[in-house]
């Protein structure tokens, strides 16, 4: 966005048998073994792993890396071939053996095009998502319009795009920068079936999001003078329902335009949030809970732990 003038894991349950001592324990073992042989009764199988997990077990290094474990490719979508938004670029994992993937659309900010947030496309896709960085109908579209366009792009992605067979249409999210971040909030409020929302240094005149039901990570920038956190990101976060899975991450010393270039802090927490809630991948909970401490890159972090989703 250019400057605004105003604006189950495998932990299956098993029945515990009280510990027996001496000959009683041995006798019990013989009886149980005999029963298993004569009746064909076997121990319960462990619960299946989360079917939506994609990729190896995450580490700090893997979520901070500029690329993940999946090779990716792209599809260019012309604005002339779609309606309701301005086209864009789809980034997707090329594998056909890992099942379907969750998907998300990312919207740019005021006066900006998809190029301003393009770095997030391959970065997130290589971690196991189908990612659609979009252009808006006009670069001056306001947040409510950008929200509708995010939803239109998701509908195209899951219903008409050439990669639709690679997508699980029940696992979708939205991300956006500045007015695109405002659009992210608008889209999440309009479509509560979304699994995750991440507004990045968002700008919106609406400050009350108490009816929003989608797990939301609000990312603000400490030195933002376009959408100051005191009047944008913090009120957005505090207005979200206290029972909602929500978090507020503030980038230390960063400007409004921090999301327009590769940023490790933005990437690692956006990825962790999307994995945790779009994929229900609790392997990523460790990076979100306990609440991350302030650091050289984080000036504030708030949230509710543990997460409900």
Curated annotation (Swiss-Prot):
Catalytic residues in the record: 178, 224, 256
Biotechnology: May have potential in biocatalytic synthesis of esters by reverse hydrolysis, particularly in production of industrially important flavor and fragrance ester isoamyl acetate. After 72 hours of reaction, a yield of 34.4% and 16.2% of isoamyl acetate is achieved using Celite-immobilized and free enzyme, respectively.
Coiled coil: none
Top-level EC class as recorded in UniProt: hydrolase
Free-text activity regulation comment from the record: No effect on activity by SDS or chelating agents ethylenediaminetetraacetic acid (EDTA) or sodium citrate. No effect on activity by metal ions Ag(+), Ba(2+), Ca(2+), Co(2+), Cu(2+), Mn(2+), Ni(2+), Pb(2+) or Zn(2+). Activated by 1 mM digitonin and sodium deoxycholate, and reducing agents 1 mM 1,4-dithiothreitol, beta-mercaptoethanol and ascorbic acid. Activated by benzene, n-hexane, p-xylene and toluene. Activated by Fe(3+). Inhibited slightly by 1 mM of different chain length fatty acids, and only marginally by 6.0 M urea.
GO BP term (any one): triglyceride catabolic process
InterPro entries for the chain: AB_hydrolase_fold (IPR029058), FrsA_esterase (IPR050261), PET_hydrolase/cutinase-like (IPR041127)
Stored Gene3D superfamilies: alpha/beta hydrolase (3.40.50.1820)
GO cellular component entries: extracellular region
Catalytic activity: a carboxylic ester + H2O = an alcohol + a carboxylate + H(+); a triacylglycerol + H2O = a diacylglycerol + a fatty acid + H(+); 1,2,3-tri-(9Z-octadecenoyl)-glycerol + H2O = di-(9Z)-octadecenoylglycerol + (9Z)-octadecenoate + H(+); (6-hydroxyhexanoyl)(n) + H2O = (6-hydroxyhexanoyl)(n-1) + 6-hydroxyhexanoate + H(+)
Functional note: Catalyzes the hydrolysis of cutin, a polyester that forms the structure of plant cuticle. Shows esterase activity towards p-nitrophenol-linked aliphatic esters (pNP-aliphatic esters). Active with p-nitrophenyl palmitate (p-NPP) as substrate. Hydrolyzes triacylglycerol substrates non-specifically with a preference for long, unsaturated fatty acyl chains with the highest activity for triolein. Substrates with cis-9 unsaturation are preferred over the saturated triacylglycerols.
Family of the protein in this entry: Belongs to the AB hydrolase superfamily.
Classification via PANTHER family: DIENELACTONE HYDROLASE DOMAIN-CONTAINING PROTEIN-RELATED, POLYKETIDE TRANSFERASE AF380
Stated name of the protein: Cutinase
Organism: Amycolatopsis mediterranei (strain S699) (Nocardia mediterranei)
Source organism phylogeny: Bacteria, Bacillati, Actinomycetota, Actinomycetes, Pseudonocardiales
């Amino acid at each position: 966005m250019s400057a605004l003038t105003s604006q189950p894991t495998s932990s299956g349950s098993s029945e515990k048998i009280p510990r027996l001592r001496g000959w009683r324990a041995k006798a019990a073992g013989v009886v149980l073994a005999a029963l298993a042989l004569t009746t064909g009764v076997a121990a319960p199988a462990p619960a299946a792993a989360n079917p939506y997990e994609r990729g190896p077990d995450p580490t700090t290094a893997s979520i901070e890396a500029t690329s993940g474990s999946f090779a990716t490719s792209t599809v260019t979508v012309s604005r002339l071939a779609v309606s309701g938004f301005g086209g864009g670029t789809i980034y997707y994992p090329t594998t056909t053996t890992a099942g379907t993937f969750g998907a998300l659309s990312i919207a740019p900010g005021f006066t900006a095009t998809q190029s301003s947030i393009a770095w997030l496309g391959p970065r997130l896709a290589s971690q196991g998502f189908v990612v659609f960085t979009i252009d808006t109908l006009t670069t001056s579209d306001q947040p409510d319009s950008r929200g509708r366009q995010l939803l239109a792009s998701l509908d195209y992605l899951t219903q008409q795009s050439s990669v639709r067979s690679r997508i699980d249409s029940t696992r979708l999210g939205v991300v956006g920068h500045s007015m695109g971040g405002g659009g992210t909030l608008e889209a999440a409020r309009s479509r509560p079936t979304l699994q995750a929302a991440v507004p990045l240094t968002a700008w919106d005149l609406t400050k009350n999001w108490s009816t929003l039901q989608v797990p939301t990570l609000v990312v603000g920038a400490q030195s933002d003078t376009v959408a100051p956190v005191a009047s944008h990101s913090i009120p957005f976060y505090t207005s979200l329902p206290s029972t909602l899975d929500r978090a507020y991450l503030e980038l230390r010393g960063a400007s409004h335009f921090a999301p327009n270039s590769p940023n490790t802090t933005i990437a690692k927490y956006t990825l962790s949030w999307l994995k945790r809630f779009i994929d229900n991948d609790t392997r990523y909970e460790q990076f979100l809970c306990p609440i991350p401490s302030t650091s050289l890159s984080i000036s504030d972090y708030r949230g509710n732990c543990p997460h409900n989703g």
